[in-house]
């Protein structure tokens, strides 16, 4: 479950070392375990675990969660979280609970992950939209841009099915569109798509392949990896129509801006920049030396993150 545990750079599940969030002080003597001649207190447990990598990641996640809840709580609804949760659950089907457990998550802790991810995504998107985009950025985006194209796309879960379909469309006089409708294993049986190179609802591998094809040309088998489920799918593409690219990038300025903003959402450095800004606004101070370096990746160059006395 790569996507579930890879929310944003440096942020991990809130399910880990949950006790840390309850430790208000290293002097807390609440007993957790008793035995003959000894007890283990919250303080004992805290001091034993706080220097571990797991504890460092848990504290980082807790800090970022608290900061973004304070600054953006009303920007993400419970309905959005539930919708995202259901989408992932549907993708995994009956194995969802097992995959959650293997990732060290419960339904509730995974929903917390989703919420944190969406809070950060909102902040990143707002920052990206407000950034000044230079002419150089627009020209670079324009150079990589392929305008609207229409393509027949077959999708398969099994590579052998894709190979059989490829042989069928290679036959003399083969009708690609008819074969696509007959053989695709896409759930909705859809085969005709119109999109540009900034499309995000189709697999990135498919969009890249289609962008590189000339009108009337067909691809070989394209393998795509679903980042949400880590499953491979196989595709065969035939581009049936391609719009002529206009010479002036300004003709696509609005669309290019959308593509540039979307690119920033996937940029770890930009994400860290936004997180750093939120942490700075919250005036976060690390009080325990054990956690002195947890915010290092968000510090400005040559800026250290010492523990506060």
From Swiss-Prot:
Question: What is the enzyme's class at the highest EC level?
Answer: isomerase
- Lipidation (N-palmitoyl cysteine) occurs at 23
**Reaction catalyzed:** [protein]-peptidylproline (omega=180) = [protein]-peptidylproline (omega=0)
Record carries keyword Plastid: no
Write down the EC number: 5.2.1.8
Cite the entry's keywords alphabetically. Cell membrane, Isomerase, Lipoprotein, Membrane, Palmitate, Rotamase, Signal
Instruction: Spell out the family assignment given in the record's similarity comment.
Output: Belongs to the PrsA family.
Per the entry, what this protein does is: Plays a major role in protein secretion by helping the post-translocational extracellular folding of several secreted proteins.
Q: What is this protein called?
A: Foldase protein PrsA 2
The organism's lineage? Bacteria, Bacillati, Bacillota, Bacilli, Lactobacillales
Q: Gene that codes for this?
A: prsA2
């Amino acid at each position: 479950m790569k996507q579930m545990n890879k929310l944003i750079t440096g942020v991990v599940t809130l399910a880990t070392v949950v006790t840390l969030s309850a430790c208000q002080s290293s002097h807390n003597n609440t007993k957790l375990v008793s035995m003959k001649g000894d007890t283990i207190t919250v303080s004992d447990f805290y001091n034993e675990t706080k220097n571990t990598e797991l504890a460092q990641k848990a504290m980082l996640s807790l800090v970022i969660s608290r900061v973004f809840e304070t600054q953006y709580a009303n920007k993400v609804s419970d309905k959005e979280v539930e919708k995202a949760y259901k989408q992932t659950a549907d993708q995994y089907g009956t194995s969802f609970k097992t995959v959650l457990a293997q990732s060290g998550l419960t339904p509730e802790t995974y929903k917390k992950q989703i919420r944190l991810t969406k809070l950060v995504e909102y902040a990143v998107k707002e920052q990206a939209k407000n950034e000044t985009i230079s002419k150089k950025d627009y020209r670079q985006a324009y150079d990589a841009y392929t305008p609207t194209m229409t393509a027949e796309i077959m999708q398969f879960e099994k590579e052998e099915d894709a190979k059989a379909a490829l042989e069928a469309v290679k036959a003399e006089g083969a009708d690609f569109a008819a074969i696509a409708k007959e053989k695709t294993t896409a759930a909705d049986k859809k085969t005709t798509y119109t999109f540009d190179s900034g499309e995000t609802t189709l697999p990135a591998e498919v969009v890249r392949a289609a962008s590189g094809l000339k009108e009337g040309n067909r691809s070989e088998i394209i393998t795509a990896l679903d980042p949400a489920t880590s499953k491979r799918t196989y595709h065969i593409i035939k581009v049936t129509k391609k719009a002529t690219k206009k010479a002036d990038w300004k003709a696509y300025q609005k669309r290019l801006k959308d593509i540039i903003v979307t690119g920033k959402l996937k940029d770890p450095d930009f994400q860290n920049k936004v997180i750093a800004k939120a942490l700075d606004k919250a005036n976060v101070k690390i009080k325990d030396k054990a956690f002195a370096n947890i915010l290092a990746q968000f510090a400005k160059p040559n800026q250290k993150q010492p523990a506060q006395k």
